[in-house]
């Protein structure tokens, strides 16, 4: 009988240790996933901030923002934005497009809202968010554009980057 108690006691202790280990693993995995989601949301918000442009922005500030935008994307990346931009972009093409954007736009306020991220694999994620552009072109007219955006993200060298963006019209 005492051997049975010892064995039963050992089994209970081992079972508790296994359950505690599994719980710690799940807790750690959940924390890492939340940390990745927060990092991706910060990436999207930072991209919107760096696409924002004021009339009085210095050249140095503009160059820093252009570099930050390019750094937010994987190389190559895919863009599907109506008539404005479509296809695969390497870093050089992306930088050239950013230069054209900044040359055409007098001022712009860009924002991202309702950012939802799903980690699909250890180094891959999908997301959706609403993007809003309110700006004035140097040629005069202003516009407000609101789009739903589907995004794919990849983690390279320990950092999340945008792999693709697909813009769709928002129904009013």
Stretches with model-predicted labels:
Residues 2-5, 11-12, 29-33, 126-128, ...:
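Short beta-strand edge/turn micro-motifs at domain boundaries
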Residues 13-72:
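Short, low-complexity N-terminal intrinsically disordered segments enriched in polar/charged residues
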Residues 34, 38, 60-63, 85-95, ...:
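Soluble non-cytosolic domains of exported or imported proteins
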Residues 45, 49-53, 74-78, 99, ...:
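Sec-exported extracytoplasmic/periplasmic mature domains
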Residues 67-85:
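Short, solvent-exposed secondary-structure junction/capping segments
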Residues 74, 112-114, 162:
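Hydrophobic residues on conserved beta-strands that form the core of alpha/beta folds
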Residues 93-139:
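Surface-exposed, charged secondary-structure patches
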């Amino acid at each position: 009988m005492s051997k049975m108690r010892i064995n039963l006691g050992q089994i209970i202790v081992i079972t508790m240790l296994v359950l505690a280990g599994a719980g710690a693993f799940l807790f750690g995995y959940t924390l890492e996933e939340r940390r990745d989601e927060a990092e991706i949301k910060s990436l999207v918000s930072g991209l919107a901030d760096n696409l924002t442009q004021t009339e009085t922005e210095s050249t140095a500030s503009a160059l820093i923002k252009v570099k930050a935008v390019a750094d937010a994307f994987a190389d190559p990346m895919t863009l599907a934005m109506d008539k404005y931009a479509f296809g695969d972009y390497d870093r050089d093409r992306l930088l050239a497009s950013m230069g054209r954007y900044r040359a055409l736009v007098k001022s712009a306020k860009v924002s991202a809202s309702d950012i939802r991220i799903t980690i699909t694999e250890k180094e891959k994620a999908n997301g959706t968010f609403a993007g809003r552009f309110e700006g004035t072109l140097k040629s005069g007219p202003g516009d407000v554009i609101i789009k739903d955006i589907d995004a794919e993200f990849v983690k390279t060298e320990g950092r999340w980057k945008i792999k693709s963006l697909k813009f769709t019209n928002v129904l009013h």
